């Protein structure tokens, strides 16, 4: 599954250089075509899980292929929201923080 590889490599990249997440304490629930995943930034480290392991700060609804574009910097979050490709529930501020993290670590 391509998303699992993306989550794993993103977490490894972030944990090698946690500068971009050092100030965060958020859980993002990603409701995608293939299922539900969570990404957590806490105590200067990143981790991810399938399902609902933690209480989410915000939830993002997006298709798998659009999430891949978002994570790789090929699709901006603002554009995705305006095009109806990304729906945010919960803290908009947390969603904006995630956008900054993705931009910081985009490869």
Segments (PLM) and residue ranges:
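Feature captures hydrophobic
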Residues: 1-107
